[in-house]
């Protein structure tokens, strides 16, 4: 059997940004690429009755069914071909790693063209959070992030993004996450913090958002308030996202309050500076009423100085109060990285300095770091 060769994405040069990946083939169309009206037209164009769209949507978005034989409301002689047309397989899970006594599961998925993406499912006492990818790789080239250093392979389709969530829901239903004796839970929180800059793949990302939040059978019916959209500071994307006026949390990966350092840590800062990103984030709060999260990976002797905490506090307060929350994140280790997490005492001082400015600050939980499933570690090591 001949295997399609895997295309190796060249490692990006230092500071180089990639907004558009090299042209590749497109994934097969899936009903999750469309809203209900689009699904009806898609099936009609393929020679099937439009009402099949609602039946298929119930199987995918409500029952999370993948077996055509179980779809008994479809004609027996057409089930296989209908499912093949409207619900083609998009993700093949080739590896799973577990941590936190089975409560955290990282899945590595192979796409139709052998591109690889990862998602992470985290089960807590009263919620289930899923971290999903919007791109295979990432073009933002942040030097402390394994995903950024792998380069951008391609954008994901809306359906490839949604299917990560559906596969996570199936895993929960089947008792594959946590204690199988406990009652199954539904995914309640979705964070676009996996591989890729979601706002650089705007159309597919927003299509996925609507499939996630739209009520079933049009979508998964997950509350928009349970979603978080992360960005490194793609200001035009933030501005565009603001106009959607959805009650989704915006998370700005800042990592430095001064342009001199942020130019090195977050290369997109050479295009849109700290103040521009913070202004856009404040405007997002004004438009949506949703408090913005500032993500700040604490890197030993690089960005963890007390004066930087003070500068960050001053810049946030300059834009008013009550609109922002800071999440310091102990830097997660990545292969070949020269940087490490801040010392505990330095981390605590940074937090206390921010709180002294009246900034709500919470050190973020780093689930899955021992399976390379935490922030900045996703790099598809299959």
UniProtKB/Swiss-Prot annotation:
GO cellular component: cytoplasm
EC number: 2.1.1.192
One of the record's GO molecular function terms: tRNA binding
Domain Radical SAM core: 124-370
Residues at which S-adenosyl-L-methionine binds: 196-197, 230, 253-255, 332
Transmembrane parts of this sequence: none
A GO BP entry: tRNA methylation
SUPFAM superfamilies registered for this protein in UniProt: Radical SAM enzymes (SSF102114)
Cofactor(s), names only, from the UniProt record: [4Fe-4S] cluster
Keywords noted in UniProt: 4Fe-4S, Cytoplasm, Disulfide bond, Iron, Iron-sulfur, Metal-binding, Methyltransferase, rRNA processing, S-adenosyl-L-methionine, Transferase, tRNA processing
Residues reported in the UniProt entry to bind [4Fe-4S] cluster: 138, 142, 145
Known catalytic reactions: adenosine(2503) in 23S rRNA + 2 reduced [2Fe-2S]-[ferredoxin] + 2 S-adenosyl-L-methionine = 2-methyladenosine(2503) in 23S rRNA + 5'-deoxyadenosine + L-methionine + 2 oxidized [2Fe-2S]-[ferredoxin] + S-adenosyl-L-homocysteine; adenosine(37) in tRNA + 2 reduced [2Fe-2S]-[ferredoxin] + 2 S-adenosyl-L-methionine = 2-methyladenosine(37) in tRNA + 5'-deoxyadenosine + L-methionine + 2 oxidized [2Fe-2S]-[ferredoxin] + S-adenosyl-L-homocysteine
UniProt-annotated location(s): Cytoplasm
Signal peptide: none
Pfam families: Radical_SAM
Residue numbers annotated as active site: 118, 375
Entry note: cofactor: Binds 1 [4Fe-4S] cluster. The cluster is coordinated with 3 cysteines and an exchangeable S-adenosyl-L-methionine.
InterPro entries assigned: Aldolase_TIM (IPR013785), Methyltransferase_A (IPR040072), RNA_MTrfase_RlmN (IPR027492), rRNA_lsu_MTrfase_RlmN/Cfr (IPR004383), rSAM (IPR007197)
Disulfide links within the chain: 131-375
Family recorded in the similarity comment: Belongs to the radical SAM superfamily. RlmN family.
Role summary: Specifically methylates position 2 of adenine 2503 in 23S rRNA and position 2 of adenine 37 in tRNAs.
Entry-linked NCBIfam families: rRNA_mod_RlmN (TIGR00048)
Other information: Reaction proceeds by a ping-pong mechanism involving intermediate methylation of a conserved cysteine residue.
Protein name: Probable dual-specificity RNA methyltransferase RlmN
Gene (name only): rlmN
């Amino acid at each position: 059997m001949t295997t399609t060769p895997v295309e190796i994405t060249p490692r990006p040069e230092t500071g180089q940004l990639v907004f558009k990946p090299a042209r590749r083939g497109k994934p097969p169309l899936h009903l999750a690429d469309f809203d209900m009206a689009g699904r009806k037209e898609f099936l009609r164009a393929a020679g099937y009755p439009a009402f099949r769209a609602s039946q298929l949507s119930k199987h995918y978005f409500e029952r999370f069914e993948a077996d055509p034989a179980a779809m008994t409301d479809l004609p027996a002689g057409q089930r296989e071909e209908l499912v093949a047309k409207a619900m083609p397989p998009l993700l093949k899970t080739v590896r799973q790693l577990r941590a936190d006594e089975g409560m955290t599961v990282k899945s590595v998925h192979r796409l139709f063209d052998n591109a690889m993406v990862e998602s992470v499912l985290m089960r807590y006492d009263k919620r289930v959070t899923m971290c999903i990818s919007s791109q295979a790789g990432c073009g933002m080239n942040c030097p402390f992030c394994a995903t950024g250093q792998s380069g951008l392979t391609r954008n994901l389709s809306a359906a490839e993004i949604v299917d990560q969530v559906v596969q996570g829901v199936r895993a929960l239903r089947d008792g594959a996450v946590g204690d199988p004796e406990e009652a199954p839970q539904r995914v309640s929180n979705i964070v676009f913090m996996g591989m890729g800059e979601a706002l650089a793949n705007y159309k597919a990302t927003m299509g996925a958002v609507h499939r996630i939040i739209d009520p079933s059978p049009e979508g998964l019916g997950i509350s928009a308030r349970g979603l978080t959209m992360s960005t490194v500071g793609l200001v035009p994307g933030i501005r565009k996202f603001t106009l959607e006026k959805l009650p989704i949390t915006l998370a700005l990966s800042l990592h430095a309050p001064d342009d001199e350092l942020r130019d090195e840590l977050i290369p997109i800062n050479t295009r849109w500076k700290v103040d521009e990103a913070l202004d856009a984030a404040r405007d997002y709060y004004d438009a949506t009423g949703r408090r913005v999260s500032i993500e700040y990976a604490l890197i030993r002797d690089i960005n963890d100085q007390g004066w930087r905490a003070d500068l960050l506090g001053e810049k946030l307060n300059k834009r008013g109060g009550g609109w922002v929350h800071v999440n310091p994140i102990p830097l997660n280790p990545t292969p070949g990285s020269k940087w490490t997490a801040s010392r505990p005492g330095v981390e605590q001082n940074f937090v206390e300095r921010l709180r002294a400015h009246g900034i709500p600050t919470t050190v973020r939980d780093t689930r899955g770091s021992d399976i390379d499933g935490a922030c900045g570690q996703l790099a598809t090591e299959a």
